[in-house]
Structures are given as C-alpha cells and as structure tokens.
Amino acid sequence: MTTETRSLYSQLPAIDRLLRDSSFLSLRDTYGHTRVVELLRQMLDEAREVIRDSQTLPAWCENWAQEVDARLTKEAQSALRPVINLTGTVLHTNLGRALQAEAAVEAVTKAMRSPVTLEYDLDDAGRGHRDRALAQLLCRITGAEDACIVNNNAAAVLLMLAATASGKEVVVSRGELVEIGGAFRIPDVMRQAGCTLHEVGTTNRTHANDYRQAVNENTALLMKVHTSNYSIQGFTKAIDEAELVALGKELDVPVVTDLGSGSLVDLSQYGLPKEPMPQELIAAGVSLVSFSGDKLLGGPQAGIIVGKKEMIARLQSHPLKRALRADKMTLAALEATLRLYLHSEALSEKLPTLRLLTRSAEVIQIQAQRLQAPLAAHYGAEFAVQVMPCLSQIGSGSLPVDRLPSAALTFTPHDGRGSHLESLAARWRELPVPVIGRIYDGRLWLDLRCLEDEQRFLEMLLK
C-alpha cells in the first residue's frame, strides 16, 4: 500500500464521529438511527473500494450528511410516484389510466379510514351482499336486471366464461379473437375458463349463417368481443348484437359480449367518436355484458358485468368470484364515479377523463402559447422551444384509430443531436414530479391535453 493510499484511507471518518455531528441529528430523527448507521457503513465500503480502484476519494466525501440525506430521500420515494402526463395519451395504461374524480377520491379516503357496510345489512344486522348497492346503481344506468363487480375486465371475462360455459363450446368470430396488453388473449382466457373455442367466419367477414352452422348440442354461448384496440376496414362483414341475439333465441343459446372500454354515455354528444354502450346491448337482449371501470368510464380499475338476473346469479355463486372480487376502496371509488352519471349535465366537468378528452384544440393552443415564453427563456440556449399542432390519443385500447386535435410544446436541439433529447427527457424523469413526454421526429413533444396544473409544471421544468 502506497503512502498516498494510506493517506486517503485515513481521511475516511469514523461512524461515531459522523453521528455526533449536528447535521446528522435530523437525519436520525427522520430515518432512524439504525438505517443511518447501516447506510454509513455501506458508504464507507464504497469509498474504500473507490480508493482501492482509483486512488481517489468519492466527491461526496466532502459532505457526508448531504449524501446520506440525498440517498435516503430517494430511497423513501414511493414506488407509485405522481407524474405529469404529457405523452398525448389520456388513458395511459403505464401511468395508471383514468384519473379519479374528486368525489371518488373522497369516497376512498372515507372507506379507508373507517369500517364500512361492505357486507353488512343495517336493516336486519345480518350479512349483506358486497355488490348490492353498486348493482342497483348499474341497473339504473344500464337497464340491466343485475350486476357483478370484479377487479378488472380480464377477470370479468374469465368469470363470465367459467361460470356459464365451462366444459362447453363458445362460438366467436375469428375477427374478434383479440389480444390486449400483456399478451391477454381471448383464446387463452377461454382455455383457463375450461371452455372450447369454436371459431367461425374469417378475419374480415363473418355472417349469421357462420354462427348458425357452428351451434351444436355442446354450445354454451355465442360471444361478441368488441375490437376496441384495433379496427378492420375495407371488405368487411359482421353481425351486430341484436341480430346475434335473435339468432341465439332461435337456437336457445345465450349471447354475451366483452365490450372492453365500456362508455356509459354517448361520446358523440361531446364531439368524440361514438363507442358502443352497455345499455344499448342490454336493450338488444344480450344476456351478459362486461366492460372496464378505468377506461372510458373514468373510474377505478374494475371489471363490471351487467345482464340477466339468472346469469349474474351463476357468476356470483361461482368459486372464482371470491378470488376476483373487488375490495372496499375500489367499490367506494366506483360507486362515487357511477353516481356522477346520474347527473349527466355536469359530467364533463366533474369526470376528469371526459374533461380531458373534451378539451378543445383552441384552448390547449392558448395554454401552449402562454407557457412557451418562460420555457424558451430557460431552455433557449440549447433548444428551440415551439408551439406545434399534434394529435392526442385516448389510449388503453379505446378508439384506436381516432385522434384528438391538440397542441404541444416541442424542444428541438440546436445542434440536431438526438442524444440531447434523450438527456433532456431523462432529466425530466428525475424531477421530484417527473414530466413525461415523447420523442418523435427529432423533437421532444409535450402534448398539453392533460396539463391542468400549470404552476406545478413550471415549478418542475424551471428548476
């Protein structure tokens, strides 16, 4: 060991001496004596390794308390960190999909802080039904006879098939054998539910007679799957639910539908593309309809099944129902969200998903112009900051081919180097509240459709 190396080792402080320093008192109060000591030992080992390999001290050895504070602060950050979503995708699956309405947030907070009547009947002091209150609300909105709630729509489809068609055949058009994120495929779900898939028709064309010819003594269901995350266009043919229900009645086979996104209002009244609604399918005579709670409905993650009472009863009594049931927080948020639909005139103001989807391009353009000046002043030395028109998307497999006119702030490096864009995006992801945009066509785009808190946005980007 050289004299220089010995000198470097000698500069490493003892843990006891560090802990006596006043700067460590607040750290010990905040994070605990044990964790601070544990980290200091780890940092001493790191410093010795750097000395051994590089014959130098780490830069942070100049201020041990500051480095300990920085590391423990980062360690204490929640795994579920709030972010500013400027990707242009409103229902971003990786960012948690639908933002919850204030009424839903308040309902969840109350449910978390207190015992609730989850399965308790106040009238006779006996055991109540977990889904009962929400079932009544869903029946009022959709016109169904009964309803069942589970933890997501994949679970809803699994339960629907397992409870009504296990050991039997389910007839589905080839053009509707969808796959959604995470390799969730309708054929795989059928296999897990114990059903046999009977494909009919072709990818682009399926006729009523295809279903008719497929039905046999082992057929349990005729199934429609709404292709919410892709679109087949051109030379196509499909039969709608009403026609399939008529065929099902003739052949004595129930019809079920996996609707996927599940909008409870006609989106076209807000200038958005129309999506099929559960109440329309119930009115057409479909026996069971499943859809998501956290997509176009704008609530928490949940799988909702509405339909005929005798069919719902089979789902409620199936062993899988207990494994897939929703908890009290989900039910509280979902109930509060559904109640907003009873007053549709205020829905676009109170439901964040609808509010963001219906923001006009003109309003977003004005917002972008307002924010351009301070950002250009801050980043102008390295980037050209411009206001550009763009197209937002709904996301989460909803209305896949439809885009919403919007406006973005774009950052283009003066030197044209893509690495500068990657570096800027990485810096923004490290902010206390990360700002998430997207890199495209030599620019970093911040689509402002989902930006409601301008002050917090500027606080982050002007740091």
Curated annotation (Swiss-Prot):
EC top class, as a word: transferase
CC annotations in GO: cytoplasm
Entry-linked HAMAP family: SelA (MF_00423)
Subunit and partners: Homodecamer; pentamer of dimers. Binds only one seryl-tRNA(Sec) per dimer.
UniProt-recorded name of the protein: L-seryl-tRNA(Sec) selenium transferase
Keywords: Cytoplasm, Protein biosynthesis, Pyridoxal phosphate, Selenium, Transferase
Catalysed reaction, written as an equation: L-seryl-tRNA(Sec) + selenophosphate + H(+) = L-selenocysteinyl-tRNA(Sec) + phosphate
Record NCBIfam families: selA
InterPro entries, per the entry: PyrdxlP-dep_Trfase, PyrdxlP-dep_Trfase_major, SelA-like, SelA_trans, SelA_trans_N_dom
Function according to Swiss-Prot or TrEMBL: Converts seryl-tRNA(Sec) to selenocysteinyl-tRNA(Sec) required for selenoprotein biosynthesis.
Biological source species: Escherichia coli O45:K1 (strain S88 / ExPEC)
Record GO terms (molecular function): L-seryl-tRNA(Sec) selenium transferase activity
GO biological process terms held by the UniProt record: conversion of seryl-tRNAsec to selenocys-tRNAsec; selenocysteine incorporation
Cellular compartment(s): Cytoplasm
Keyword Protein biosynthesis: yes
Enzyme Commission (EC) number: 2.9.1.1
N6-(pyridoxal phosphate)lysine PTM positions: K295
Domain of life: Bacteria
Cofactor: pyridoxal 5'-phosphate
Pathway assignment: Aminoacyl-tRNA biosynthesis; selenocysteinyl-tRNA(Sec) biosynthesis; selenocysteinyl-tRNA(Sec) from L-seryl-tRNA(Sec) (bacterial route): step 1/1
